[in-house]
A protein has these predicted regions:
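A glycine- and charged-residue-rich anion-binding loop/surface
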Residues: 1-174
Length: 174
């Protein structure tokens, strides 16, 4: 169910003529909200037989805001909706998220346990992993890190998903 609509301000309904970006807050959602360097999910919210594109999802204080492109579809607080993520895109993001973990583990193996994540960006097409180290990596170190990551991928280990807070994740080596 739609809990809130946010256009230029919070409102109870958006009439037929509404076009442009709005935020929908639902009572529950399968969408991942942008956070920790990872982009938010996209997909559709189905309402009254029409599909409303979700172009991004943000999370703020535990509230998921679905950023939607309205094309005149009327939406009101209380409407029953079905939320569907773009599963192909989500899978690509999930794989890149896992690659970031593999990269960090390989960096720690090659460079030492002092390596810590200093930032990251994960989307469906790429991963950027920022880390702290006291010198530039050599060509040999880069090759060893790449080989370790590729070996882990080829092993095809089952992926275990754990949801935790940042502090616990850091203690566990993330």
């Amino acid at each position: 169910h739609v809990l809130a609509l946010i256009d230029a301000e919070t409102t109870e309904e958006l009439p037929d003529a509404s076009d442009g970006k709005v935020m929908l807050v639902l009572d529950r959602t399968p969408f991942y909200g942008e956070g920790g360097g990872q982009v938010g999910d996209t997909g559709v919210i189905e309402c009254a037989g029409r599909s409303i594109p979700v172009v991004d999802t943000k999370k703020n204080s535990g509230i998921y805001m679905h950023i939607c492109e309205l094309d005149g579809t009327p939406v009101s607080v209380g409407d029953t909706v079905t939320a569907r993520i773009d599963a192909v895109r989500r899978e690509a993001i999930r794989r890149n998220h896992s690659a970031a973990h593999l990269l960090q583990a390989a960096l720690r193996t090659v460079l030492g346990d002092h390596v810590e994540q200093a930032g990251s960006y994960v989307d469906a097409e790429r991963v950027r992993f920022d880390f702290k180290h006291y010198s530039a990596m050599t060509e040999e170190e880069l090759a060893r890190v790449e080989a370790l990551v590729n070996e882990e991928i080829l092993r095809g280990e089952e992926i275990v998903t754990v949801e935790t807070d940042v502090e616990t994740a850091r203690k566990d080596g993330a």
